[in-house]
């Protein structure tokens, strides 16, 4: 089952539809099933199109119920509904902030909750949460996007420990920059405040440098199948050739700071009882 927001799954940096080509059946969801027309025409009955707004919890439960009823079982659930929001923290409105969290975080939570009873009953299954390098590190201008992905990372790590005994696996896929429309027409942008013009320009230049060699979404197909087919899949895996170096530098910086301030941390514990 593949929930998506607006775009068909093949326009995401993680494309799981090679499962169809090897004989699997897929329930693909979108708010408007017309966006899934090409998939149905290409793959026929192997693709079950379902309408779903992932921010509607009841609708998520109903879509998962229908998918299970029509397909007979759920082997893999791929949560890749999401979009990017560009805006410095001061610029983001309440409505914009709530919508970013509703789609990117709560959407994945509702679909996950809806699928878990079926996966528990059958004694196996794999939940793929499409996160981002933005769930590990953080950059200016996309703070609310980071909040949504860090939340996804947190509940998914907890979930993996909660459901391991039921034979259910959880994997967070963390892509870096790919040649998709993530920062294009599918993105949302807050009204800019002139006070941030200088840092905005610097941020966009840094982003352009990071995106100088974007990844090919088509190459993720074999990667996602390798993760799904693995007997012991990872809890986290990067997609792309840049995230590991970036995350390593980020975590080394955190460790350095934690160690430098360890004496204060320990002092904050207070005297032992």
Task: Enumerate the language-model features and the residues they cover.
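Substrate-binding pocket helix/loop in short-chain dehydrogenase/reductase
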Residues: 88-89, 96-98
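Residue(s) in the substrate-gating loop at a strand-loop-helix junction
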Residues: 132
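A glycine-rich helix->loop->beta "capping" turn
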Residues: 45, 66-79, 85
